[in-house]
Amino acid sequence: MPTKSIKIMVEGGNVKPGPPLAPTLSQLGLNVGEVVKKLNEATSSFKGMSVPVTIEVDSNTKKYEIKVGIPTTTALLLKEAGASEPSGDPAHKKIGNLSLEQVIKIVIMKKPGLTTKSLKAAVKSMLGTAKSIGVTVENKDPKELVKEVEEGKYDDLLAKYENEWNEVKE
């Protein structure tokens, strides 16, 4: 069965039946409206964020499968912080604040794409990203939280999520 893969970035829950997607789907003999509807359903939980999507199409049967990826770390942090874009000056202009628990939940969601093996290391990496886009965590500079995480100040909170972290397949 010859398959064709279409890899695209879409806005979660807001895919439109226009170019460049529609012509590609039409060439493969797919119903554009139906595919767009299914894309919007599949990405609705990521409303307003750019989401990587792969559509696997069987050229013979015209059956297709939609595989939704995970939005970028920046997009997830921005959504959680209620901001639309990163700070142009993250050292001086803060765009939002998150709890460490919110950061941990994003880390768990992103685990399949991360190279870090421990929850603690992944959280420290995510704190670095938060700092680079102007998001504070626990009303502090994320760099300060990295030190506190290393010192063990949040070990109890991390332990609470350790099982969930371990259950996620890489």
UniProtKB/Swiss-Prot annotation:
Biological processes annotated in GO: translation
UniProt xrefs under CDD domains: Ribosomal_L11
Membrane-crossing residue ranges in chain numbering: none
Entry keywords, A to Z: Ribonucleoprotein, Ribosomal protein, RNA-binding, rRNA-binding
GO molecular function, one term: large ribosomal subunit rRNA binding
One of the record's GO cellular component terms: large ribosomal subunit
NCBIfam families: PRK01143.1
Subunit structure: Part of the ribosomal stalk of the 50S ribosomal subunit. Interacts with L10 and the large rRNA to form the base of the stalk. L10 forms an elongated spine to which L12 dimers bind in a sequential fashion forming a multimeric L10(L12)X complex.
Family: Belongs to the universal ribosomal protein uL11 family.
Known role: Forms part of the ribosomal stalk which helps the ribosome interact with GTP-bound translation factors.
Stated name of the protein: Large ribosomal subunit protein uL11
Organism of origin: Saccharolobus islandicus (strain Y.N.15.51 / Yellowstone #2) (Sulfolobus islandicus)
